């Protein structure tokens, strides 16, 4: 049944109509009533079907709306959370800014202790004082300009200001002059001290030059003495060969004394080389010792020995010659060591003199004891290189 078709009229029957009306008419009315009921039922079914589809559509729409609302709610919740987070960050920043704007005592102390800030404050303080002075001066000038030319107070005030300005200028000049005088005095002292240092440096340079010259001279003398020492060494080797070739006891006795003297003389020259030309006293003592040995040998020559003692004397002379040669070698090695260092120590000199004295025979010392004082007195006249040259001349 469509909406365009008109609905049948509703049939209404009362009890009187049932009693009065005929059967055919009642059936016709009943049919009309049935048609009306069917029309209502069809309309109701149509309405029900339309309502279900509408409800379903509305339900779907409501579900979509609910989903959209839920999504919007989630978005809004997220936005709210972000806003709350931003609010918290803002509150923390506000608190931090408040703390920064209201620094603590420690921060204030640290800022005041900072040298850069202190310098900045000092400059600001100086500028403030200057501006204050300028302001006071301007105010004084302004107040002075307010006075009339005939005003006595204004004249007195300006005269007082001029007097104070002059006094300040004089005080500043005095302070600057005193400081300049102090600086000039200090500068003069420094100049004097520098001149003294320069003079002392020049003296030291001259002294060093003199020392260099002396060292060069000593090196030249050492070279000459080394050459002489080599010559004496060669001569000693020749004398030793001659001594070995000699066969007669008397000749061996006489020739044995000469190498001993020569070995002692060369040993003394070697000991002189250890300390250079300056140690003349030690060389004189050593030459006196050599004088002792030579005079001891001459005394032995004065007294003739028995034939039985000839071999003994030759043996003793050979022993003395061997000892003299060994002592000469030791002295020569020590002399070369001392030549390497021209300023030899006195300990090496005393050690060499002790070695030389220890090589003497007790018999020779006994023989020389009688003439020791006279020989020492004669030998003390010699000095320096002259003693070594005389000894070498006597050996040659």
Swiss-Prot record:
Which intervals carry biased composition (Polar residues)?
340-356, 380-396
Question: Where is it mainly found?
Answer: nucleus
A biological process term (GO) from this entry: mRNA modification
N-acetylmethionine-modified residues are 1
Q: Which Pfam families match?
A: Wtap (PF17098)
UniProt family annotation: Belongs to the fl(2)d family.
List the protein's name: Pre-mRNA-splicing regulator WTAP
């Amino acid at each position: 049944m469509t909406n365009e078709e008109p609905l049948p009229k509703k049939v209404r029957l009362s009890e009187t109509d049932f009693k009065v009306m005929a059967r055919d008419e009642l059936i016709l009315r009943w049919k009309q009533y049935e048609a009306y009921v069917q029309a209502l039922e069809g309309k109701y079914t149509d309405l029900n079907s339309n309502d279900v589809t509408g409800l379903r559509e509305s339900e779907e729409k409501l579900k979509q709306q609910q989903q959209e609302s839920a999504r919007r709610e989630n978005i809004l919740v997220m936005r709210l959370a972000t806003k709350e987070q931003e609010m918290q960050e803002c509150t923390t920043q506000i608190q931090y800014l408040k703390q920064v704007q209201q620094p603590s005592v420690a921060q204030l102390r640290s800022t005041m202790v900072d040298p850069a800030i202190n310098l900045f404050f000092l400059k600001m303080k100086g500028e403030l004082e200057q501006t204050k002075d300028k302001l006071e001066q301007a105010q004084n000038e302004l107040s002075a300009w307010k006075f009339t030319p005939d005003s006595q107070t204004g004249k007195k005030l300006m005269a007082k200001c001029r007097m104070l300005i002059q006094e300040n200028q004089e005080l500043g000049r005095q302070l600057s002059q005193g400081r300049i005088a102090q600086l000039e005095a200090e500068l003069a002292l420094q100049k004097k001290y520098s001149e003294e240092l320069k003079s002392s440096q020049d003296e030291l340079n001259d002294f060093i030059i003199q020392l260099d010259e002396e060292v060069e001279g000593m090196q030249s003398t050492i070279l000459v003495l080394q050459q002489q020492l080599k010559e004496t060494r060669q001569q000693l080797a020749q004398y030793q060969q001659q001594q070995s070739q000699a066969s007669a006891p008397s000749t061996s006795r006489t020739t044995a004394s000469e190498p001993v003297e020569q070995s002692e003389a060369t040993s003394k020259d070697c000991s002189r080389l250890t300390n250079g030309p300056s140690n003349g006293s030690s060389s004189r003592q050593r030459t006196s010792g050599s004088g002792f040995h030579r005079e001891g040998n001459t005394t032995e020559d004065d007294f003739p020995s028995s034939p039985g003692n000839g071999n003994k004397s030759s043996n003793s002379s050979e022993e003395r010659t061997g000892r003299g040669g060994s002592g000469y070698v030791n002295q020569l090695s020590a002399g070369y060591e001392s030549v390497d260092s021209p300023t030899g120590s006195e300990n090496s000199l005393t050690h060499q003199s002790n070695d030389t004295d220890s090589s003497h025979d007790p018999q020779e010392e006994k023989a020389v004891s009688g003439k020791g004082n006279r020989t020492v007195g004669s030998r003390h006249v010699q000095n320096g290189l002259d003693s070594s040259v005389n000894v070498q001349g006597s050996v040659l």
